[in-house]
Amino acid sequence: MNILFYDMGSYTYQDTLYYLKQLGHTCKTVYYHFPDKFHDDFFCDRFEKQLQSDSYDAVMSINFFPLIADLCHAHQIPYLAWCYDSPLEEKLEEYFSYDTNHIFLFDRIEAEYYQQLGYSQVQHLPLAVNTERLDKLQFSPAQIQKHRCDVSFIGHLYESPLQVLLYSADDYIKGYIEGILQAQLRVYGYYFIDELITDELLDSVNQSFRKVGQTSLTLNHRGLSFAIASEITNLERCFLLEQMGELFNTHFYTTKPHSLSDHVISLGPVKYMEEMPCVFRSSRLNLNPTLKSIQSGIPLRALDIMGSKGVLLSNFQPELVEYFEDGQDLILYSSMEEAVEKAAYYLQHDDIREQIAQNGYEKIKESFTYPDRIQKMLATI
């Protein structure tokens, strides 16, 4: 196939492009960074000219872009969007109904949600890892020593808007939402926040905005759900890092400032292609506290850890246990306290930990390959 690829610096672009070409497809890439992904006349003009300059069988991107969906629909060209972000921004849904769309989400529950709304163009497809590239990486003793630690986490602490949203709410509303938050914080594998956000609760929150003159702000169900999920994720990640930092040599790699204690060694960001695999391989345990609103799927971080022959210490995710066995291929926890307990145990058992790393890698190499995922996407056209 002749494929036009759009990219704005996504993590998985290079690996996807490599395997598209390995499978015999011709690819041309348009690079562009959207100031506003919903309105951009310059991009639309440039991209449309590119579409008209050749006979393309499909357009592809990592993550979904509404302007590309518009243009592909206008030209009746299939648009394949493979997403590693979840949950998707709510406004994107307005563009899902085009018959030219082929949207692939790694979270099965999120994909089923859109399918139940009638968007048959949305499908479930797990992410992939390029173990061929990772196997070729070689790290110097200095690089390994720099990143050698007991526990590491690459990511960020979510800045939830929840406290701002509830600033003008009465004590009952604040207490009710705090109860939801504390309950969900302790439950893994089942996301019940959506069930507890009633129309009456939303109406009360929105009335509290109007009482203080915020007439332009209206919060919907998904907005409040994501705010609560982000707050929970922030609390969980802070707790885990603080606890791990007090007990073990713990590294935290992030692009944003934070207020964690000095027990946690902050080393700033790392480059995805070159440095991140070294972190995963050099760390004795790699944390993966998943964003709470990712209800079932396996995030890219978890797959990259195992694909780099790192040991994954993750919260329970339904799709993880479909492919991997706890204590054999990875280490799962069902509470924050259990995460700390399991970290202490496995840090004392190097041989078990090393076997887990090898087993997880073999499962990734077998079941999470780019050729398989690409062929499944192209088969939908």
Describe each PLM feature range.
Residues 46, 68, 91-92, 274-275, ...:
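Short acidic active-site motifs
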Residues 64, 83-87, 108, 126-129, ...:
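Histidine-centered beta-alpha loop that forms part of the nucleotide-sugar donor binding/catalytic region
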Residues 72-87, 102-105, 127, 152:
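Active-site proximal beta-strand in glycosyltransferases
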Residues 1-75, 222-226, 250, 370, ...:
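N-terminal pre-catalytic "stem/leader" segment of glycosyltransferase-like enzymes
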Residues 2-12, 120-294, 318:
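Nucleotide-sugar donor-binding catalytic core of glycosyltransferases
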Residues 4-7, 11-14, 18-23, 28-35, ...:
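Catalytic binding pocket for nucleotide-activated donors in carbohydrate/polymer assembly enzymes
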Residues 80-95, 105-106, 133-135, 220-221, ...:
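Nucleotide-sugar donor phosphate/pyrophosphate-binding loop at the beta->alpha transition
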Residues 73-74, 95-98, 144-146, 245:
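Short, conserved loop/helix-junction motifs that constitute active-site signature segments
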